[in-house]
Regions:
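A cross-family kinase active-site recognition segment
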Residues: 120-171, 192-194
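Conserved NTP-binding catalytic cores of kinases and kinase-like/nucleotidyltransferase enzymes
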Residues: 1-90, 209-212
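Short, P/G- and charge-enriched loop/turn segments at secondary-structure junctions
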Residues: 29-30, 95-99, 184-193
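Generic alpha-helical secondary structure signal
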Residues: 105-108, 156, 179
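Short Pro/Gly-enriched beta-strand edge/turn motifs at strand-loop
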Residues: 20-28, 178-189
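Contiguous, function-dense segments enriched for cysteine-driven chemistry
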Residues: 158-178, 203-211
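ATP-binding pocket architecture of kinase catalytic cores
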Residues: 46-145
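Active-site acidic catalytic loop and adjacent metal/ATP-binding pocket
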Residues: 37-48, 52, 182-214
Length: 214
């Protein structure tokens, strides 16, 4: 989840949205806000095809992080896992950027996934397929070796927390964090117990096709 201050700024700035979406062909009258959570997401259409513009503030998600995401998604598609695909911009890029008074924003566009959204009233078969899809994703993640872009890990997150605590002189919290880091570092890191997972594999992020059951 992004900072509330970042969310408020991003939602209030049409200039940022206009500056980013102009890099992809679109029908102006179809643009609408889809959501603002860990990213800003704008839904739009072009010639009756549906797309999503996803953008984020540089302090929330670096360009290196986004490049690593796209590399992983390319790996999933190459291994026949159903995953949305990024759309090349009019400039020939997968990632576009725009500078604003508060900093840089990075954007990617994805073609809308096939299938339908599911509500919480799943059938037994759909529950089974949901679990199979997550299991297949984690099996692929277990074998995944980044080619060029390695995503940040838990140590990067905790190091970021440490820098914030030190800045605010939270001595007791710093001691507790140091204990936590030592405990986590003592856990053996194996392919069977450590790797990339999907932390938000919920219905909002899934589309289901009845005929293929994926």
């Amino acid at each position: 989840m992004m900072k509330l201050s970042t969310m408020a700024t991003g939602l209030a700035s049409e200039d940022v949205i206009n500056s980013l979406i102009k890099n992809w062909a679109h029908d102006e009258e179809t643009i609408r806000l889809w959501r603002a959570s860990s990213n800003f997401v704008i839904a739009y259409s072009k010639d009756e095809e549906h797309y999503f513009l996803r953008f984020s503030f540089e302090q929330e998600k670096s360009i290196e992080h986004i490049q690593a995401e796209l590399e992983y998604m390319s790996y999933l598609n190459a291994n026949h896992y159903p995953c949305v695909t990024p759309v090349v911009s009019l400039n020939g890029n997968y990632i576009e950027a725009t500078q604003s008074p508060e900093g840089m924003y990075y954007a990617v566009v994805f073609k809308a996934a096939q299938g339908k959204s599911l509500d919480e009233n799943l059938t037994e078969l759909q529950f089974e397929d949901w679990g199979k899809a997550l299991g297949a994703l984690h099996r692929l993640s277990e074998a995944y070796e980044p080619v060029s872009k390695k995503r940040g890990d838990w140590q990067d997150v905790l190091n970021g927390m440490a820098s914030i605590l030190q800045r605010h002189h939270e001595k007791e919290a710093i001691v507790e964090l140091e204990h936590l880091i030592k405990e986590l570092q003592a856990i053996p890191v194996l392919k069977s117990n450590y790797g990339l997972i999907h932390y938000d594999f919920q219905l909002d992020n899934l589309f289901y096709e009845d005929d293929t059951r994926i």
